[in-house]
Design a protein with these regions (language model features):
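Small-residue-biased structural context
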Residues: 1-173
Length: 173
């Protein structure tokens, strides 16, 4: 393998993390748009909206579970000074899981016809989820992109770990 190829491999993990975060941000924005369309009376029926939410929630949960079980232990081993950062990120994951559960519960009880009370509750939950997720991603990117770019984990090259997977037409999953 030439040096350029090796260098690209070494910088790819941080770049891949950023790509996953961009994708998850886009998924959340698309879900928010679908929720707004539903409450404005011209969106998906509740069943389809719940399926849309489930897709986003599953992707975010898979990403964070992959970090907690795979990436963070590897980073902690190689960079022990980041253990507090990783602990903070895990705490965010727990908070995001709780918010995802709240959103899913609200969407499970959506009426067939939108109503203002439900709209307010759902929009508040999406706003809270978005705020925590954005803050979490920015913090994680500032703390871990350069670290990930400095790492060479052969098994991550051979089998893309869950925290770096994207479900799309490019075949990332």
């Amino acid at each position: 393998m030439d040096q350029n190829s090796a260098a690209n491999r070494l910088t790819s993990f941080g770049t891949q993390l950023l790509e996953v975060h961009i994708w998850l941000r886009e998924m959340l924005e698309d879900l928010r748009d679908s929720i707004d369309a539903y409450f404005n009376g011209n969106g998906l029926p509740p069943r389809d909206l719940r399926a849309h939410c489930l897709s986003f929630c599953t992707a975010l949960t898979r990403h964070h579970t992959g970090e907690d079980r795979g990436a963070f232990p590897t980073i902690a081993e190689d960079f022990p000074d980041l253990r507090k950062v990783l602990s903070d990120l895990r705490a965010d994951h727990n908070q995001l899981d709780w918010l995802l559960g709240n959103l899913q519960n609200l969407l499970e009880s959506l009426p067939e016809k939108p109503d203002p009370t439900t709209a307010s509750k759902v929009r508040e939950e999406v706003t809270a989820l978005s705020a925590i997720m954005q803050t979490h991603f920015i913090y994680e990117e500032k703390q871990l992109i350069s670290v990930l770019n400095s790492m060479d984990v052969p098994e991550w090259h051979e089998n893309r770990p869950d925290f770096l997977q994207i479900d799309d037409e490019d075949g990332y999953r």
